[in-house]
UniProtKB/Swiss-Prot annotation:
This is HTH-type transcriptional repressor DasR. Residues 17-87 form the HTH gntR-type domain. GO terms for cellular component: cytoplasm. The gene is dasR. It comes from Streptomyces coelicolor (strain ATCC BAA-471 / A3(2) / M145). It comes from the Bacteria.
Amino acid sequence: MSTDVSSAENEGGATVRTARVPKYYRLKKHLLDMTRTQTPGTPVPPERTLAAEFDTSRTTVRQALQELVVEGRLERIQGKGTFVAKPKVSQALQLTSYTEDMRAQGLEPTSQLLDIGYITADDRLAGLLDITAGGRVLRIERLRMANGEPMAIETTHLSAKRFPALRRSLVKYTSLYTALAEVYDVHLAEAEETIETSLATPREAGLLGTDVGLPMLMLSRHSQDRTGQPVEWVRSVYRGDRYKFVARLKRPQD
């Protein structure tokens, strides 16, 4: 990798070499500054232009661009080029629905039903939902969008025995939590949520409009009602380039 080296004299007259600054880092800093000062949708100069301007290879340019795409600062559109990305959607970690979260940020939430049906609970899922292994579980898979842009793939699991005819109720209610409250008088009170990272599979990338292998945020939520009974187990995959989660922390009381 090409580097820039400069030198200066110290008070004693000796030559002191300063730290090497790889051209790659100068290029990436330039692009990063661009994402901070330019409006979303601003095109990034072509690879050959950047390579000539920074006297580096197109391979180096490609690496810098790809890293900023992964970080969600740039957006690559097939056949069109690379552009400054929109700011990430910021979501507080709290027990609210996707619909509530998006509307709180002035975004219009919509969902596309990918699959709905019954599966048989294995030992792990049975334990999460407090049902017998082999029991029926309603599995709902949805593509979550904000202002028409795909954001996440959400897969929800609920006990079919505890929530009979829920599948039909969801025809009337667009929000699952509203259906649980109004039809079954079940209100979520608390949940344990785990956040991990994963890489987009070909199917996930196709649904979310991202590159295969792009870092994803994988959330697992296990929710309980006011009596402490399990209500749902949800696994969601969010676009790492478009989403960030925010937690507010407090020191424990002495």
